[in-house]
Amino acid sequence: MWGGIYAILFSIATITSAENPVRNGFPKIITQPYEKITFSKVEFQDKIVGSELQYSHYLDRKYGPIQPGYSISVTDQGGLWLGSGFIKKVNLDKNIRLNFDFFPGIYIQSKEVDLGGWLMFRSGIELEYKIGKLWSVSIAYDHRSSGDLWKYNPGLETIRFSLSKNIM
């Protein structure tokens, strides 16, 4: 359920963007690229079952209000996820942003929990605080599931803490 809600929030934030209304289409805009390292607790069926380390890279362009990126993560049980998608940032204050992301990707289970298939969609909500011109920290909640592509689709959540650095 949460993944669907996050996907809807991502869509609403994108469509209603004050910075680039959808009526303008999705023009290519040069923007600040950045990298993010994320440390997470993995939650499965309301229980913390492990940890995850994630690396994300966001490109030097946006299409309208959304910035493309790619990401890879590995859990302490060897579960691997890699994907590519978009982030939408909403400025709440000079240094505070509310971010929504949507990343389709490939899931390799290893000894991790069975999520029902190999194609997984990650969507999340993140509160980010900018520290100077280069750094930011954030906390987030993320949902990963197949979007009911397979009969068995239990989903997986992560509770994330991230450190990001702009690429100069």
What is the predicted function of each stretch?
Residues 51, 129, 154-168:
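Outer-membrane beta-barrel "beta-signal"
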Residues 52-56, 83-85, 124, 160-162:
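Membrane-embedded beta-strand positions in outer-membrane beta-barrel channels/transporters
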Residues 57-61, 88-90, 129, 143, ...:
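Residue-level signature of outer-membrane beta-barrel architecture
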Residues 1-29, 168:
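Cleavable N-terminal export/targeting peptides
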Residues 35, 61-68, 94-98, 133-139:
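Repeated loop/turn-to-beta-strand initiation elements of outer-membrane beta-barrel proteins
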Residues 99-156:
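Outer-membrane beta-barrel translocator/channel fold
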Residues 37-43, 53, 57, 68-74, ...:
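Transmembrane beta-barrel strands of outer-membrane/channel proteins
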Residues 41-52, 72-83, 92-94, 110-118, ...:
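Solvent-exposed loop/turn segments connecting transmembrane beta-strands
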